[in-house]
Amino acid sequence: MRKRVYYWTDSEHINKPVISDTILNTGVKINILKAKVEPQEAFLILELFGSKETIEKALNYLSKFGEVEEISKVIKRDLEKCVHCGCCITQCPINVIYMDEDYNVVFKEEDCVGCKNCLKACPFKAIEIFE
């Protein structure tokens, strides 16, 4: 099973090995998809792998040190507004958006992490974010 989450923590926990402790204490595998760490807070997008029970245990552990929010379907593209210009492609940090061999923009929506870079880049406002 795989689950993606947003994770926020404050300055009290930034210098602690929370992610590695979560892995060691629960057996979950964690992929850090995005991390923004500042002196007063940290924001991460995490992808957790394991059984349902292992992932739930890991989420409970992480929530002791910060706020966890599950990422569901994040982006939606309006095909009537999209002109396949590709502005969104270069802004996607995990290559969820790409151009196929026919020069059409393709979204792998199920892999989106919700960074919202594509939304900001689209000059035609063809991308919506589910909050």
From Swiss-Prot:
Binds 2 [4Fe-4S] cluster. Its cofactor is [4Fe-4S] cluster. Pathway: Amino-acid biosynthesis. [4Fe-4S] cluster 2 binds at residues 92, 112, 115, 118. It comes from the Archaea. Pfam families: Fer4_7, NIL. GO terms for molecular function: 4 iron, 4 sulfur cluster binding; metal ion binding; oxidoreductase activity. SMART domains: NIL. [4Fe-4S] cluster 1 binds at residues 82, 85, 88, 122. GO terms for biological process: methionine biosynthetic process. Keywords: 4Fe-4S, Amino-acid biosynthesis, Electron transport, Iron, Iron-sulfur, Metal-binding, Methionine biosynthesis, Repeat, Transport. Residues 73-102, 103-131 form the 4Fe-4S ferredoxin-type domain. PANTHER family: ADENYLYLSULFATE REDUCTASE, BETA SUBUNIT (PTHR43687), L-ASPARTATE SEMIALDEHYDE SULFURTRANSFERASE IRON-SULFUR SUBUNIT (PTHR43687:SF6). May form a complex with MJ0100. Required for O-acetylhomoserine sulfhydrylase (OAHS)-independent homocysteine (Hcy) biosynthesis. Together with MJ0100, catalyzes the condensation of sulfide with aspartate semialdehyde to generate homocysteine. May be involved in the reduction of the disulfide formed in MJ0100. This is L-aspartate semialdehyde sulfurtransferase iron-sulfur subunit. It comes from Methanocaldococcus jannaschii (strain ATCC 43067 / DSM 2661 / JAL-1 / JCM 10045 / NBRC 100440) (Methanococcus jannaschii). The lineage of its organism: Archaea, Methanobacteriati, Methanobacteriota, Methanomada group, Methanococci.
